Regions:
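Conserved Nudix-box catalytic region and its N-terminal flanking loop in Nudix hydrolases
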Residues: 65-114, 126-132
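Active-site segment of metal-dependent pyrophosphate-handling enzymes
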Residues: 116-178
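Intrinsically disordered, low-complexity domain-flanking/linker segments in eukaryotic proteins
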Residues: 59-71, 124-148, 197, 207-210
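Residue-level signal for short segments within beta-strands and strand-turn junctions
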Residues: 55-57, 78, 173-174
Length: 238
């Protein structure tokens, strides 16, 4: 994993862009046309694109400049009780809008809307482990959409209405201090979780605070968080 960022942002982009995600500097419709045009592939094409914002509690570039006295933590938000998948935990994120300038803007916009944080850099991509194919229904196996998602590193899933979604996860650095402000219409709480806490799906009680069970929206959500920690740890030892 590299921390290098482009020296200058493309026109109209207010955040730094990691070199590995230049391909996502396309509007959602343009990205779908380039990669999933009808007749270009035998795979089922996604109906919608979505993004997830993975935010650590410290800038990546600070890892090598100071001793890590505490393990890194990732931001999680808890879904509102009146929404689908009530009270489950996830990263900030959501669907790409067709009028978003680029997919990276979609991710930064969702982070701002759901957590009140301003992105200052976007990328790298966190490739989703091959979990979608494992959890696919028997009716969906072999049709190609899960194999395609695995190949391009995203999480694929079907909505309750049967629409196929491809979701990309990016590591984002944010303007400091990171004062999280959730939208109560979508989320009711937030917390910062370590790798061990994500792995064991629990934050133990400490200092009089009750422990928290980390019940995630999907197993893929948890898997991609562990992959993000893996990228972080690989960067430390490079």
């Amino acid at each position: 994993m590299t921390s290098e960022l482009s020296d200058s942002s493309p026109p109209g982009v207010l955040f730094k862009v990691h070199p590995s995600v230049q391909d996502f500097l396309l509007s959602p419709p343009a990205y779908k046309t380039r990669h999933f045009a009808q007749g270009q592939s035998h795979h089922d094409n996604p109906n919608f694109l979505a993004t997830g914002a993975i935010v650590f509690d410290r800038p990546l570039h600070s890892v090598r400049t100071s001793a890590l006295k505490t393990p890194p933590r990732i931001l999680l938000v808890q879904r509102a009780p009146h929404d689908s998948m009530p009270l489950l935990w996830e990263t900030p994120g959501g669907g790409c809008d067709d009028d978003d300038p680029t997919i990276l803007h979609s991710c930064a916009r969702e982070l701002k809307e759901e957590a009140g944080l301003d992105a200052i850099s976007v990328g790298p991509l966190v490739r989703c482990p091959a979990a979608s194919a494992e959890t696919a229904t028997e009716e969906s196996r072999g049709k190609g959409e899960f194999e395609l998602a695995e190949a391009i590193g995203c999480h694929s899933f079907f909505t309750r209405r049967g629409k196929l979604v491809f979701k990309f996860y990016f590591i984002l650095e944010v303007k400091q201090p990171a004062n999280v402000l959730v939208d109560p219409n979508e989320h009711v709480a937030y917390l910062w979780a370590t790798e061990d806490e994500v792995r064991h799906k629990r934050i133990e009680s400490e200092g009089g605070k009750e422990g928290v069970e980390l019940n995630f929206t999907t197993e893929e959500q948890r898997s991609v968080l562990l992959e993000a920690f893996k990228q972080w740890n690989n960067y430390i030892v490079e």
